[in-house]
Amino acid sequence: MAPMGIRLSPLGIGVFCLLALGVLYHVYSGFLTGRFAAFLLGDRAGDTVDLRELLAVSVRAAELGGVEVKKVRESNSLNEKAKGKTREGEDEKMTSGDVLSNKKMYHLIKNAFPAVLVNTEEQVDPDEEDAVSWDHDIPDEIKDKIKTSKPVSSESITIWIDPLDATHEYAENLVKYVTTMVCVAVNGKPVIGVIHKPFTGYTAWAMVDEGANIKKRSSYNEKTPTFIVSRSHSGEVKEVTRQTFGNKTEIISAGGAGYKVLSLLDVTADEQEKADVYIHVTYIKKWDICAGNAILNALGGHMTTLKGEEISYTGSEQNEGGLLASIGMDHSALVGKLAEKISVNAKKPAK
């Protein structure tokens, strides 16, 4: 008698082989996809970052940068030079304060979180090293507001550093306008903002949906708002805003995007002018505005282009659409009143 067993037909064997090949293909192709993604992302692949820790590092970075900024200014060793031209044809200034602050801020963040992408105003030699390190201390002020860790994937993060905001005013010794800033964007949205004033030691920080050490003011003037604007743009803004809101509309001319954002908030313990709306009518770099955008978002405010568009903090360093920032106001109404009159100037040189 022939032994009993299972006999497969040639068709059955063929089907089995095809199924096995299909399984192997999916397993192996998934493996290759993962390896390829890791190759593209380098050290960033698969890492997670705690946003609470990153906030603590960002605050420390802004403070360390501020130490360098203040030291250079007080020693009068600016070594001022032009690093290029602005679109308006003016020299774009750089000082030792910019360079030394940039070095400290960049390396502190990269040494603490090597997997994150950092965009900074001044060039950094990737082979240059700095021993500055984070001590892993999270200040009680942050732990009181943000109780637990907030992990996100490192590849979703873009950090924007401004090592010295208001360089022009810094060179003129108008130091009240000077700030150092750090912003953390997650998938292009500003989530963490830090603005530090080196010459007073004041620091504002916020994390969207989590907490802040600063708040909005108790009231704002929507009928005849006070506008704050760059010192070189006050003439054209004054004309448009007074046509829209009346001759009693006040214009504050000031330096520094960080200073202007703080003017919208409750900064009672520091020398700070107060405004209701911040307008910028030409293009502006994202490291100038990201930190302020994050803080305003965390407090329920808004920062958009002059057309009311949200600003994405990925890709290009430039924001071409001008700027409108407010809090405690009807932002959409402001956009509606001002967009048609000002947006046409967004790419024109400042007067």
Swiss-Prot record:
Listed pathway(s): Polyol metabolism; myo-inositol biosynthesis; myo-inositol from D-glucose 6-phosphate: step 2/2
Alphabetical GO biological process terms: inositol biosynthetic process; phosphatidylinositol phosphate biosynthetic process
Leading EC class: hydrolase
InterPro entries reported in the protein's UniProt record: CysQ/Inositol_MonoPase, Inositol_monophosphatase-like, Inositol_monophosphatase_CS
Alphabetical keyword list: Hydrolase, Magnesium, Membrane, Metal-binding, Transmembrane, Transmembrane helix
Taxonomy, superkingdom: Eukaryota
Transmembrane segments: 11-31
GO MF terms, alphabetically ordered: 3'-nucleotidase activity; inositol monophosphate phosphatase activity; metal ion binding
Record-given protein name: Inositol monophosphatase 3
EC number annotated for this UniProt entry: 3.1.3.25
Location within or outside the cell: Membrane
Membrane topology classification: Single-pass membrane protein
Protein residues bound to substrate: E121, L164, D165, A166, T167, D288
Cellular component GO terms, alphabetical: endomembrane system; membrane
Residues that, per the record, bind Mg(2+) 1: E121, D162, L164
Gene: bpnt2
Residue sites binding Mg(2+) 2 per the record: D162, D165, D288
Cofactor list: Mg(2+)
Catalytic activity: a myo-inositol phosphate + H2O = myo-inositol + phosphate
Family designation: Belongs to the inositol monophosphatase superfamily.
